[in-house]
Design a protein with these regions (language model features):
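Terminal, non-globular segments
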Residues: 1-180
């Protein structure tokens, strides 16, 4: 004799049921351009801003909000290549393009799995993705291009902390651009 099966009290959530957001074309164009402008031009004047990676934060924001790996890759590639183009002659084209494409894919894939609206989750996501971003950037630069890059765990940890704190507030500001 078998016991009656207990009814499942949870819910099955399919990929289609997870809320994915859209953005106006103006937001899609202006938000990354402002982030890239700040990163490229204001960090030359305000050296302490150099620890922040605003384009990476924008890639993660759009990727987790859209929850589509293809759009995450495309967003990361475009923002990364624009960032590369403004990097100057000493910066090879494609390093940020590759890095931000990988981050865009990972963030959009993760956005389907977990709640990314929580500030604590956003903090952890940016902290981890900054470390991954730096690791991929170092791997591409050192491994493929044979650049003499220096790796410092303390610098990466402090940078990840600073980026995560700023990203929590930045994401709250960017939430205003979301459309269903």
């Amino acid at each position: 004799m078998t016991a009656p099966a207990m009814p499942f009290r949870g819910s099955y959530t399919s990929r289609e049921q997870v809320a994915a957001y859209e953005f106006s074309w103006l937001a899609i164009i202006l938000v990354p351009l402002v982030a890239i402008f700040i990163q490229a031009f204001l960090t030359a004047k305000l050296r302490w801003l150099a620890i922040l990676d605003l384009p990476m934060m924008v890639v993660v924001f759009f990727a987790v909000a859209r929850r589509n790996p293809i759009s995450g890759c495309i967003t990361g590639a475009i923002i990364g290549l624009l960032q590369d183009a403004l990097g100057g002659p000493a910066h090879p084209i494609g390093m940020y393009g590759i890095t931000d494409t990988i981050i865009g894919y990972m963030a959009s894939s993760l956005g389907v799995k977990i709640d990314v609206e929580n500030p604590g989750t956003r903090f952890l996501i940016i902290y981890v993705f900054f470390v991954v971003h730096q690791g991929v950037y170092y791997g591409v630069g050192h491994g493929l291009l044979r650049q003499s890059l220096q790796w410092s765990w303390s610098h990466v940890a402090i940078g990840a902390l600073a980026n995560a704190v700023v990203a929590v507030f930045l994401f709250q500001m960017l939430d205003r651009f979301k459309q269903r």
